[in-house]
Amino acid sequence: MMQSVTVQQEPAESIQVAIGLVAWNEERGIGATLHSIFDQSIFEELNRRGWKCEILCLANGCTDRTAAVTGEIFDQQSRQHPNRAAFRACVVELGERGKINAWNQFVHTLSAKEARYFFLMDSDILIHRRETFWNMLQALEDDAQAHIAVDRPCKDILFKPRKSLRDHLSLAASRLTSSAEAQLCGQLYCIRAGIARNIYLPKDLAACEDGFIKTLVCTDFLTRPSASSRIRVAEGAAHIFEAYTSPAAIVKNQKRQIIGQTIIHILVDGYLKTLPLYKQARLAYTLEKKDRTDPEWLKRLIHQHLGQTRFWWRLYPGLSGLGFQRLRRLRWRERLVCFPAAVASSLLAFVSGRLAFAALRSGCTNYWPQAQSKV
């Protein structure tokens, strides 16, 4: 079931930007997220150019008042925002829970067909800089080679005046992750609509959809070697998210990541490369049709992969020792600072990898740990 509540209507032909806010049971925290969105300078810039923006809150499988709270804020902003002429806002209630379905619905069904740029974002983050959205959009406007613009993700613990040893370890782990080129954080990014519309997320992808999108975009849909230039980091753009700090939450999150990366490996390094070029060129149509006509196809591929994989560290290439691989990209001084995080990362991979391996063998792919609290 899908129900749409439109708060403000504008002529559809003027929509240039569409923002998809994916929300699940965020009644308590979504207000802060929405206010950080409406504080963005992008609405003033769009208004100046005569452009329009639509904001869709994709409330998926919610059992609380997320949709109602969002609708109230949308109604208030549509009446009081100084640049209210530059946007329309809509709450969409999706009966099916999950980011994968919400993403597909937004990109292929719900967003304005004439939109040139999509912002995809989670509903439990805060936009840190007022110019973030506009700088991300400008990054794509100024660089024809880039298809995705990203900002800088900041853990909330970064702003603590007094950081614990665990906080420092967590921040060092983030430094290791950011050392790789072409990083795509699924919490917030801007993508050219034409590129997004050729991507369909298989329903059993489970997690790490950002890794799947990154691979397709950087390889021009698997037609050439990966090019990091397809993803552009926007200057002066950042958002804040709540860091996992408890050992249990960290292990659960890493378990989810390993499950997702395993499925991406099965798809990208296996199945998709066997497709004829004409099917790769129409990848969204190909994968959507596969999901529709053969709903169990990806689960069979996962089962087949597990039958050929004896040990957890062989779920996908580079799983073991990933922290030390990332450490080599850093300068010597940074290596010393981040060495404890690399050790912790390897130990975490050992624990989470075994749990992910067991979960996959038991047929569990739709695993999603709940955040500890709201930002």
Q: Residue spans of the language-model regions?
A:
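A short, conserved alpha-helix in the catalytic core of glycosyltransferases
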Residues: 206-229
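Active-site nucleotide-sugar/metal-binding loop of Leloir-type enzymes
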Residues: 101-117
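Conserved donor nucleotide-binding strand/loop of the catalytic core
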Residues: 68-101, 109
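Short, acidic, metal-binding catalytic loop of nucleotide-sugar glycosyltransferases
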Residues: 35-52, 76
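Conserved donor NDP-sugar-binding/catalytic core segment of glycosyltransferases
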Residues: 126-163
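Terminal low-complexity segments of carbohydrate-biosynthetic enzymes
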Residues: 252-375
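Short beta-strand-to-loop acidic/aromatic patch adjacent to the donor-nucleotide binding site
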Residues: 114-126
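A conserved acidic beta->alpha catalytic loop
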Residues: 50, 56-72, 96, 125-126
